[in-house]
Amino acid sequence: MIDFDVEPEFQKQIDWVERFTKDEIEPLDQFMSVGRRKDGSPLDGDSWGVIRRHMSNLKQQVKDQGLWGFHLGPELGGPGLGQVKLCLLNEKLGKTRMGPSLFGCQAPDTGNMELIAHNGTEE
């Protein structure tokens, strides 16, 4: 049987991700799925600029929590959480469209990051 219990400090991170997902990511997902203003008109370049700035702010909040690129091991600048903790975090983010992008763990970047880190050169 797999033990899914985690230490209290990590549970606080899971709880933060759950709140962040509900309060920030789900509304963004809803907006992005429509991609229009309240009056039904399509978004213009200025609107997308506002969205990009908002997403940058959300990414910074994730980084401030130490959860950016949480799938990476410590040798690549990540926390090296292990499979159970990865599963618990991905369970929360997998319910959203934009969550993985905001946490720096979206496909195909997750696999590519490791490949470049292990096989890339300075060039």
What residue ranges belong to the model's regions?
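Short, conserved phosphate-binding/catalytic loop or strand-edge motifs used
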Residues: Q106-M113
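Short, intrinsically disordered, charge-balanced linker/junction segments flanking boundaries
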Residues: G120-E123
